[in-house]
């Protein structure tokens, strides 16, 4: 699965888990645009990912991490979060 589709699924799953409708994004985006994102037809900008995550009530990195877990068909976030922690520590030195 490509990253556009997995990000779309991450948005959709997060939205549904929080019982948010596509219409609830009206302050940041149209329902049609959210639908196209969820179907993996478009790639949102970083600003749009941030805005969408705020509406859902999660950190943007949670949304991105979930999308990579979906892409790799993995449900264990421990490995990817450990990798991120190691890489952040290396980059921040």
Outline where the language-model segments fall.
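A short, Lys/Arg-rich alpha-helix, primarily the initiator
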Residues: 1-17
